[in-house]
């Protein structure tokens, strides 16, 4: 009699545990999809016939993440090769899937929606040299690019037409005009396409400006000469780089050398030689490149230049081949959706997926106009020529526009 009672009690406890486990899984969302059945049907398993096991599901406003524990022998590519079947199973667009791996765990991420990101001249204004470029789709945190950091020196922005390159460039330049004085940063702009950057010709920060392609060799040669003058000054004052010089001595500004659509200079050996010099030697002198192109192929950006550029902002590409040329294998730029949807690769971010900030032309013009009307008495920048001539630093301003 007592045995029957214990057996009945044990059965009840087992059933209760099963019910509790079932409801726990439902609460965690683990029963939403039968992944075990899916993996068997599409044959994601190892030689021992072991399958991935769903370990966790987490969601944010923008991304839903499925975490799987994978037995030895199952590769990340096994998931990627079946992205179409997995997207159908989850009832989502295939382009919204992201696959990644960390040791024995594989993550399938589903983009639920992209945040709306508008550059706000008040909210996004900063005192440092970090430039807000967008919001992380995974953490929703503001992603900053410090263009003065040695690990981030030089940048190219690349992607297909319509991906958002021009807007990204407008955000970067507008933010610097909005946040930094001319004693901190200045621009040398090659406006190859003659359209998107014309308003910056009138910005206080712009010291050199040209349109089209004629004369680019002389323009860049002058930049190299400026770099050489800066290094002579650094040597004279026993400083390793411009950052140290600015801390110890005077505020020579960082110079951002912007070249829009570098494909226009394909085959121009003089152009490539000067860009190569600036890419390999410019960082210490605070001469930093910002290059824009659809595709930085070898003919447009040789390895002697590309290997010295530490920041890549990749936007949507037509296919994985173009994505690999821009940001390396498995960079996944072909999965981006355009309109500022991007990935950043620099010293702090290894392919962080972001929704880039948007700035309208009207806001950009307002920032430039407001900056040009500022009548505050500000400490002026020192020029390399001033220091070369042994004049008292600060007596000569960089431009009458200051």
Residue locations for each model-derived region?
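P-loop NTPase catalytic phosphate-binding loop
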Residues: 1-20, 63-67, 102-103, 121-236, ...
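N-terminal "pre-motor" subdomain/linker immediately upstream of P-loop NTPase catalytic cores
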Residues: 12-141, 150, 296
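Residue-level detector of alpha-helix boundaries and kinks
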Residues: 70-71, 207-208, 247
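Mid-core helix/loop region of P-loop NTP-binding domains shared across ATPases and GTPases
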Residues: 237-254
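Surface-exposed substrate-engagement region within the catalytic domains
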Residues: 322
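Charge-patterned, long linear interaction tracts outside catalytic cores
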Residues: 371-384
């Amino acid at each position: 009699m007592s045995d029957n009672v214990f057996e009945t009690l044990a059965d009840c406890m087992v059933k209760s545990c099963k019910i509790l486990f079932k409801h726990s899984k439902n609460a965690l969302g683990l029963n939403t999809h039968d992944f075990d059945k899916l993996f068997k049907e599409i044959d994601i398993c190892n030689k021992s016939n072991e399958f991935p096991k769903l370990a966790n599901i987490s969601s944010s406003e923008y991304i839903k993440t499925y975490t799987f524990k994978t037995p030895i022998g199952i590769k990340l590519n096994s998931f990627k090769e079946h992205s179409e079947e997995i997207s159908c199973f989850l009832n989502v667009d295939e382009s919204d899937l992201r696959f990644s791996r960390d040791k024995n765990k594989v993550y399938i991420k589903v983009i639920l929606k992209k945040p709306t990101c508008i550059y706000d001249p008040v909210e996004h204004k900063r005192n440092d040299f970090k430039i807000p470029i967008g919001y992380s789709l995974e953490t929703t945190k503001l992603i900053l690019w410090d263009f003065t950091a040695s690990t981030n020196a030089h940048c190219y922005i690349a992607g297909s037409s319509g991906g958002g390159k021009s807007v990204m460039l407008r955000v970067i330049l507008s933010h610097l005009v909005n946040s930094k004085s001319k004693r901190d940063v200045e621009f040398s702009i090659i406006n190859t396409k003659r359209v998107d950057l014309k308003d910056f010709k009138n910005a206080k920060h712009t010291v050199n400006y040209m349109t089209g392609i004629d004369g680019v060799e002389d323009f860049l040669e002058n930049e190299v000469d400026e770099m050489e003058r800066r290094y002579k000054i650094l040597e004279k004052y026993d400083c390793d780089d411009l950052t140290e010089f600015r801390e110890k001595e005077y505020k020579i500004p960082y110079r951002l050398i912007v070249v829009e659509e570098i494909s226009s200079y394909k085959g121009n050996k003089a152009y490539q030689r000067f860009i190569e010099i600036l890419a390999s030697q410019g960082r210490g002198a605070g001469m930093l490149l910002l290059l824009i192109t659809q595709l930085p192929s070898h003919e447009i950006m040789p390895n002697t230049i590309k290997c010295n550029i530490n920041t890549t902002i990749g936007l949507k590409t037509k296919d994985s081949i173009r994505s690999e040329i821009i940001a390396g294998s498995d960079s996944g730029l072909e999965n981006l959706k355009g309109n500022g949807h991007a990935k950043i690769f620099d010293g702090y971010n290894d392919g962080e997926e972001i929704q880039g900030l948007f700035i309208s032309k009207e806001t950009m013009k307002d920032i430039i106009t407001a900056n040009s009307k500022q009548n505050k008495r500000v400490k002026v920048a020192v020029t390399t020529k001033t220091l070369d001539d042994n004049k008292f630093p600060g007596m000569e301003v960089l431009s009458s526009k200051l």
